[in-house]
Amino acid sequence: TIGVCYGVVANNLPPANEVVQLYRSNGLTGMRIYFADAKALSALRGSGIGLILDVGGNDVLASLAANASNAANWVRDNVRPYYPAVNIKYIAAGNEVWGGDTQNIVPAMRNLGAALKAPGLGTIKVSTSIRFDAVTNTFPPSNGVFAQAYMTDVARLLASTGAPLLTNVYPYFAYKDNPRDIQLNYATFRPGTTTVRDPNTGLTSQCLFDAMVDAVVAALERSGAPGVRVVVSESGWPSASGFAATADNARAYNQGLIDHVGGGTPKRPGALETYIFAMFNENFKTGELTEKHFGLFNPDKSPAYPIRFQ
């Protein structure tokens, strides 16, 4: 599955019904939204598009963790009115949560899981979406281990429910932080790169993306959750306004990603469910200027650069 993350940190994006049409006309079968956006959820009815539904900010996460009735109310308001007409696959209890807020992840996941046990909702899986740096010792990939203890609890909960771990994987940031040791071609799926062999497993990574995903897999194994699937909940490359942020590199990376993930990684061959960040260039994004330029499309729905999804 290739999905695309539909962020709305902008003031110039098309209405949600046109966005869903743009997904469908491009053959995109997955979407991620970052809060329970009623306009997007309504527009998705009957589309068949598989959805990652984020709960929203850390305040929402804290409320869901605080007690079961808050989670039941959230499901009543944001899931029941839409499911199954909207194909909600996963609920993400937090996105790149860090610091003290991490203590809310497992309780929120448990409370949401209990609320979804109600009749007719049982196929929706609850997870959380992590930054890649939740894993440490990532080279070679087989040495990967979760950096903090709470992730072991997350992994074991996922193992018990059959839900995947949602992971944001950005070779761009790894390359930007260490261009001396990482080749651009290796980071962008371009051919002719050095391959990297893992001395512990004998497996060879042809691209940085595979090495990163397989480090997450190793961390899951080390935490006693070898059966948990990884879903790449964000990955992408900026096309402007920063180091190595060009349309050429963004196209190479995202086209390479689309063409690559059907085969999985050396450690886990087979299709890898992946969501590209992001659908649109978002002009109100804060932080580094590149944050405004991760989009596959401009707000007028024209492609930011040529790309094919099939």
Curated annotation (Swiss-Prot):
Active site (catalytic residues): 96, 234
Keyword Transmembrane helix: no
EC number: 3.2.1.39
Tissue distribution of the protein: Young leaves and roots.
pH-related activity note: Optimum pH is 4.8.
GO BP terms, alphabetized: carbohydrate metabolic process; defense response
Highest taxon of source: Eukaryota
Gene3D superfamilies named in the record: Glycosidases (3.20.20.80)
Pfam families in the record: Glyco_hydro_17
Alphabetized GO MF terms: glucan endo-1,3-beta-D-glucosidase activity
Residue spans crossing the bilayer: none
Catalytic activity: Hydrolysis of (1->3)-beta-D-glucosidic linkages in (1->3)-beta-D-glucans
Annotated PROSITE patterns: GLYCOSYL_HYDROL_F17 (PS00587)
Key words of the record: Glycosidase, Hydrolase, Plant defense
InterPro entries cross-referenced by the UniProt entry: Glyco_hydro_17 (IPR000490), Glyco_hydro_17_plant (IPR044965), Glycoside_hydrolase_SF (IPR017853)
Assembly behavior: Monomer.
Family recorded in the similarity comment: Belongs to the glycosyl hydrolase 17 family.
Protein name: Glucan endo-1,3-beta-glucosidase GI
